[in-house]
Amino acid sequence: MILDDIRDAIARADSEAFDALLNAEDSDLNAFSLDALLGMCVLAAAQSQSRNESRHQLEIGRLLVARGARADGPLGNERLLQSPLVMPITSLNDSDEIVAWYDLLIGAGADPNSISEVLVDGFRCRMLMLSRVCFFFPVTVLITTEDRFELIKILLRAGANPNPGVCDRALDLSRYGLPHSAAWALDDAVARAPELANDEHYVAAKRLVKGVIAAGSYKKYLRLPLQELLNLLSLAQRGKFATTDPVMKSLVGVDNHVVWNVFTYWVES
């Protein structure tokens, strides 16, 4: 049965065989769930102890997403695996692949604000994915602090809420209770591992999270420097600010809306 062959190819991390099976003339893609196969692939990749196998699992994941597989449903037990985003950060393999998995799964619809449970001092604590990633900052065996910071940026770009419960209508607080914030998770991380206070990626992550909370959103946070530039530009255009910078001089005669659009494009791309 072709479905059994496909499952076997996923388990063996045989991306070439998997691709051939998907493209076979007798392969009926409607006979099975691509979403379920993607979930199976994520689990297999996280449990694999071979980096080579894990890389092939990632390639299989990309093939499934290219075929239309979605990652917007729970992966397993609702309390512990609310999102497929939980599994890559438990992987035994290369942290670069964890980042690639996050890019792939979020692009396929994985919810950056999904809730899962984390054991903290023997108690089950509810955390959004961003808080969970921040909480485990001290764990550097499987993922570098640089790549963990990259995961934080990916989640924030996708709309992750660093401060749950504050103007967040998407959270069912009656069902889950108030999850821990990303700021709390970062503070708790450095309390458990004081050396993080001198880690440039931890410091950058904390500055980013606090900046996003203060600004109200990741997009607003990114635009703060642009707004400051426009404020200076406006002063220069009105003759209240003198500059020797050639770039600023060239911008004085350009409409502010044009300047804003150009710099916003550079930042977001």
What do the PLM-derived regions correspond to, one by one?
Residues 13, 45, 49, 56, ...:
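Ankyrin-repeat intra-repeat helix-capping/turn positions
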Residues 3, 15, 82, 244, ...:
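Generic preference for well-ordered alpha-helical elements
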Residues 53-60, 101, 105, 125-133, ...:
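Extended HEAT/HEAT-like alpha-solenoid repeat tracts in very large eukaryotic scaffold/adaptor proteins
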